[in-house]
Amino acid sequence: MFMINVLLLIVPILLAVAFLTLVERKVLGYMQLRKGPNIVGPYGLLQPIADALKLFIKEPLQPLTSSTSMFIIAPILALTLALTMWIPLPMPYPLINMNLGILFMLAMSSLAVYSILWSGWASNSKYALIGALRAVAQTISYEVTLAIILLSVLLMSGSFTLSTLIITQEYLWLIFPSWPLAMMWFISTLAETNRAPFDLTEGESELVSGFNVEYAAGPFALFFLAEYANIIMMNIFTTTLFLGAFHNPYLPELYSINFTIKALLLTCSFLWIRASYPRFRYDQLMHLLWKNFLPLTLALCMWHVSLPIMLSSIPPQT
C-alpha cells in the first residue's frame, strides 16, 4: 500500500515537471513576441512527451576519461534527492508526517550539492568542474540564509513540523509579519535552484553549459527533471511557509486547489524573472549574500527571538 502512495506522489510530480518545461518555453516565447512550441499536438501540448522520447532513446555518450560509476550515479542521485524532498510537504497531508520535516528538507537540499559536485568532477572536463564548483559555492552560500530565515519563521509557528504551519496561518499569512524575510527567501530560492538571474553554473557565454556539459540523452534528462522538480518543490515550500492556504478538514480538496494556484503563480514568477533579468556577475552574487542578506537575516532572526521574550510570550509550543 505504501508503494502505491509513493507512486501517487512521484508520477504527478514528473508530469508536472514535464509540462513545466512546456509552460516555460511558451511563457518565454510570448514574452519575446513569438509562439513557442506549437507543432507537436494541439498548441504544442505534446512537446514534453516528444522531448522525453527523443532524450531517452538517444545513445548515452560519455567521455573516455570520465569516471564511469560516478558519472552515472550523479544524475540518479540528483533526481532521487529532488523527489525525496517532497515527502514531508503537506498538501494538505504529507506522505510521512515527520517531527523534524523542515530539518529533513534542509538536509536533503544540502546533499543535492554532492550530485552537482560529482557530475562536474566525474566528467573530467575543466568547464564542467568550474561549473560544478560555482554551483556548490552558490548553493552552500545561499543555504545559510535559507536556514536562518526558516528559523525565524519557525519561531512564529513553534514546531519543526510542516503541518503546524497550516494551523499557524489560519488567520494571518506569515508573509505579512515577516515580509522582508519572505523577499529574501524568494531570492535565495532562485539562487538555490540555479535559476536566472543566478544561473551562473550554466553560463553559456563562458562555461558552455556548466556542470552537465558532458552529459547527453538520459542522464542529461535526469538532471533536467531534478532541476524542475526542485523549482516546483521550492515554490510549494514557500507557499507553505508564507502563504498558508485555509484548511478545512472536511474539504481538503479546497486546500489543495488554493495551495496549487499559489504555487503555480510563484512558479510563473520564476519564469517571468528569467525572461526579464540578465545574469549576475559572480562576485556580485556572493556580495549580495554575504554582505547584504546575511547581516539582515541575522538581525531579523535576533528580532524574532527577542520579541516573544520581550512581550513575555514564549513561542507557541506544539
Curated annotation (Swiss-Prot):
Cellular component terms (Gene Ontology): mitochondrial inner membrane; respiratory chain complex I
Which Cys pairs does UniProt list as disulfide-bonded? none
UniProt-listed Enzyme Commission number(s): 7.1.1.2
Q: Keywords, A to Z?
A: Electron transport, Membrane, Mitochondrion, Mitochondrion inner membrane, NAD, Respiratory chain, Translocase, Transmembrane, Transmembrane helix, Transport, Ubiquinone
Query: Where are the membrane-spanning stretches?
Result: 2-22, 70-90, 100-120, 147-167, 171-191, 217-237, 253-273, 294-314
Q: What is its main location?
A: mitochondrion
How does this protein sit in the membrane? Multi-pass membrane protein
The question of whether Coiled coil is a record keyword is answered with no
**What catalytic reaction does the record list?**
a ubiquinone + NADH + 5 H(+)(in) = a ubiquinol + NAD(+) + 4 H(+)(out)
Cellular compartment(s): Mitochondrion inner membrane
One Pfam family linked to the record? NADHdh
Q: Which GO terms describe its biological process?
A: aerobic respiration; mitochondrial electron transport, NADH to ubiquinone; mitochondrial respiratory chain complex I assembly
- Reply yes or no: does the keyword Oxidoreductase apply: no
Q: Which GO terms describe its molecular function?
A: NADH dehydrogenase (ubiquinone) activity
Entry similarity comment: Belongs to the complex I subunit 1 family.
Describe the protein's quaternary organization and the partners it interacts with. Core subunit of respiratory chain NADH dehydrogenase (Complex I) which is composed of 45 different subunits.
What exactly does this protein do? Core subunit of the mitochondrial membrane respiratory chain NADH dehydrogenase (Complex I) which catalyzes electron transfer from NADH through the respiratory chain, using ubiquinone as an electron acceptor. Essential for the catalytic activity and assembly of complex I.
PANTHER family membership? NADH DEHYDROGENASE SUBUNIT 1, NADH-UBIQUINONE OXIDOREDUCTASE CHAIN 1
Protein name as annotated: NADH-ubiquinone oxidoreductase chain 1
State the species of origin.
Equus caballus
